[in-house]
Amino acid sequence: MMHLLADPETWVAIAFVILMGLFAYLGVHRMVLKALDHRADRIRDELAEAKRLKDEAAKVLADYKTRRASAEREAEEIVTSAKAEAERIAADAKAKMEDFVARRTKAAESKIALAEAQALADVRAAAAEAAVQAAATVLSQSVKGGLGDDLVAKGIAEVSRKLN
């Protein structure tokens, strides 16, 4: 047995048994279990909080995606509406321009017709005046005397009245 007392491993085993007994007597194992339970509870709470935050983040992400899709649809509607409005404005402007051109053309044609009619009237008046002058000259040379002058004056007045 002496041989066992000289062996350092024996003393380590005896010290270990005494230490474990002392720990058991003082209730160290309860303190360790309590600390481990406390740590497990804290980890469980952190996991629950992490799950809650994950769920909340998923809801926020879903809300963001919904809002983004809604905003994209709204933007497309705005673009479509703007294109339709631009096309309507362009068509309206084209119609107004065509109407303006048609009115201007009609007014120009009316002015041209009026000018033609005036020119024709002026030409007729000039022709009538020339015919009257020619007739007066011919008659005055062929008929002499007071009666001739009278006839020439009446004839000129009648021709002027009928031609104008």
UniProtKB/Swiss-Prot annotation:
Q: Where are the transmembrane segments?
A: 8-28
Subcellular localization: Cell inner membrane
- Protein topology in the membrane: Single-pass membrane protein
Give the UniProt entry's GO cellular component terms.
Answer: plasma membrane; proton-transporting ATP synthase complex
Where does this protein chiefly localize? membrane
Question: Mind telling me which CDD domains this protein's record contains?
Answer: ATP-synt_Fo_b
Arranged from A to Z, the UniProt key words for this protein are: ATP synthesis, Cell inner membrane, Cell membrane, CF(0), Hydrogen ion transport, Ion transport, Membrane, Transmembrane, Transmembrane helix, Transport
The UniProt similarity line reads: Belongs to the ATPase B chain family.
> Could you tell me what this protein does?
F(1)F(0) ATP synthase produces ATP from ADP in the presence of a proton or sodium gradient. F-type ATPases consist of two structural domains, F(1) containing the extramembraneous catalytic core and F(0) containing the membrane proton channel, linked together by a central stalk and a peripheral stalk. During catalysis, ATP synthesis in the catalytic domain of F(1) is coupled via a rotary mechanism of the central stalk subunits to proton translocation. Component of the F(0) channel, it forms part of the peripheral stalk, linking F(1) to F(0).
Name of this protein? ATP synthase subunit b 1
- Its source organism is Bradyrhizobium sp. (strain ORS 278)
